[in-house]
């Protein structure tokens, strides 16, 4: 298991913040900053924030 993800799980547990942190880490590793940005935009949309004006 990945040490960073393991530590995130220890600190945040199965909270929304922990899940977001895990998704951001995985996205960054797979697609770099653009991938992390996409995950963050999707998360903000789920919270009801208007992200239409944010550049991709």
Swiss-Prot record:
Question: In the UniProt record, does the keyword Cytoplasm occur?
Answer: yes
Q: Which domain of life is it from?
A: Archaea
Query: Where is this protein localized, as stated in its record?
Result: Cytoplasm, Cytoskeleton
The answer on whether this UniProt entry bears the keyword Cytoplasm reads: yes
What is one cellular component GO term in this UniProt entry?
A: cytoskeleton
Please classify the protein's predominant subcellular localization into one broad category. cytoplasm
Name the keywords, alphabetized.
Cytoplasm, Cytoskeleton
Please share what else the UniProt entry notes about this protein.
Answer: Belongs to a conserved five-gene operon within Thermoproteales denoted Arcade (actin-related cytoskeleton in Archaea involved in shape determination).
**Function recorded in the entry:** Part of an actin-like archaeal cytoskeleton.
Can you say what this protein is called? Arcadin-3
Identify the coding gene.
rkd-3
């Amino acid at each position: 298991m990945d040490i960073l993800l393991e530590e995130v799980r220890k600190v945040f547990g199965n909270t929304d913040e922990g899940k977001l942190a895990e998704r951001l880490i995985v996205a960054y590793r797979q697609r770099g900053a653009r991938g992390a940005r996409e995950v963050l935009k999707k998360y903000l949309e789920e919270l009801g924030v208007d992200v239409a004006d944010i550049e991709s």
